[in-house]
C-alpha cells in the first residue's frame, strides 16, 4: 500500500503563514503526491481548494448541511470550498470538546453519506496502556464499533493519547503490535496511519513498519521544510 503523510496544523499556525505554506507546498510537490500528502489547516487557514498536488482537508465540521449552529462550519461551507476530506474523532476533540461516541457516530454517518474521505482517529490513554495489551485491544475495538469499517473512503489513524505532543513516541514494538492487531479488524484496503510525536528523526523508521501505511503529524509538520523531509521518506 502507498505510504501517506498528513499534516495537522491544529490551532497553532498563523493564518497567513498557513496560506503561504499551502501555496509553497503546491509548488514543491507533483501530481502523484495528491493521494499521498494531506494537509489539515484550521478553519481560517483553509483556502478554496484548487490544489492539484496534495489533498486539503478540514479538522472538523458539524454534521448538518447548514443552519443555526453558532461557531461551527458545516458540509455546505466545505463543499463550497471544494473540500471533501475531514478529520473525525481526534483525541483533542474527544477530551477538550467532549465529543461523545454517539456524536462521533452521527458525524461519521453524516459525512459518509456525503461521500467525504474520513480520517478517523483512535487511541488509548496511558492508564489503559499500563493495564496491558489486552486492555488496549478492547479499548480500540470499542472506539471502532460505531463506524462502518467497510466504508471505501475511510482512513484510520492510531494516535496513542499519551504520545501526542509529549515528544515521546510509542516504541516501534508498541506500534508494530498495535497496528498488527488493528489490521486484523480493518478492511484490508483501509489505510492505517500512526500519529503521536512523529518527527523528522523517527518518521522514516516508523514508516518502515509494514503495517504502518502512513503518518498523521502534528507539530513536526508546522515547518514546511520538516514536512517536506518526511514526505521524502514515503
From Swiss-Prot:
This is Triosephosphate isomerase. GO terms for cellular component: cytosol. Involved in the gluconeogenesis. Catalyzes stereospecifically the conversion of dihydroxyacetone phosphate (DHAP) to D-glyceraldehyde-3-phosphate (G3P). Homodimer. GO terms for molecular function: triose-phosphate isomerase activity. Keywords: Cytoplasm, Gluconeogenesis, Glycolysis, Isomerase. Its EC number is 5.3.1.1. The active site is at residues 90, 159. Gene3D superfamilies: Aldolase class I. One of its GO terms (biological process) is gluconeogenesis. InterPro entries: Aldolase_TIM, TIM_sf, TrioseP_Isoase_bac/euk, Triosephosphate_isomerase, Triosephosphate_isomerase_AS. It comes from Helicobacter pylori (strain G27). Substrate binds at residues 8-10, 165, 197. It is found in: Cytoplasm. Belongs to the triosephosphate isomerase family. PANTHER family: TRIOSEPHOSPHATE ISOMERASE. Pathway: Carbohydrate biosynthesis; gluconeogenesis; Carbohydrate degradation; glycolysis; D-glyceraldehyde 3-phosphate from glycerone phosphate: step 1/1. It catalyses: D-glyceraldehyde 3-phosphate = dihydroxyacetone phosphate. It comes from the Bacteria.
